[in-house]
């Protein structure tokens, strides 16, 4: 009972941090709007609640800044952080590798190649209000998932190592193709690199809804199957001896998580270390039960990336840093410490 209270307390603290972080993120920017004002303006956009919030003291421009610029960006950063963090936690169990992250199967490389083609060749396509780069990135990511499964994961007895090696090989191939394309189109290299380093500057409500729906479905599947992750973490032979169809569950989880990563990367670019760092911190706080780790990773990942994005758009204002740079600054030292601890 005491442990349950402790875990509940940690969840409440994490949720409170997420809320406070969101309020601060909404209030920070070139236009000065206080925290209370930002919260009021954000609440005014919620159907059924907005009519009870007095925002008469705020200008039309301030309402637009909060509701159409900052709020979609804050929510999108939180959603992508939650998705990448949960994906990293699942992959670390599936591949029995504490250094596994959401990009381990080459999904991000596929998305990056799709985005590169869209940028360099001026492809014009839009689906449900999502622009060319996002659509092409998502298509590239989905095609990568299909390739990985066709080559390394379709057979019933396919081993994890086969899927992993296939993903690594495809990722290397796509990276080489990207390098070739960029070497032939020098004038647009900067735009490609900026996308690859991650940014939420193009956040709009359509992207928020799209990612939210994808994540809701995928995370529900992951949470339902989280009890099997606990058994798989003990080793494949142990799980099989307990009657768990590890191959089937692994295939489902890899597919679902990869689709979630594809949705995240298509709207944000390639952002590293979120799915590597946060699951380990959450595991330290909540133990090794993945029924507790996944909700914690969702909250922790959302908070971490939201704060990193806030720093990215304010540290060098009116300019903006790629958010992937900040996540790498935080994540790389942690990765070094993790490797050092494993070697010891």
What are these regions (language model features)?
Residues 1-344:
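Alpha-helical transmembrane segments in inner-membrane proteins
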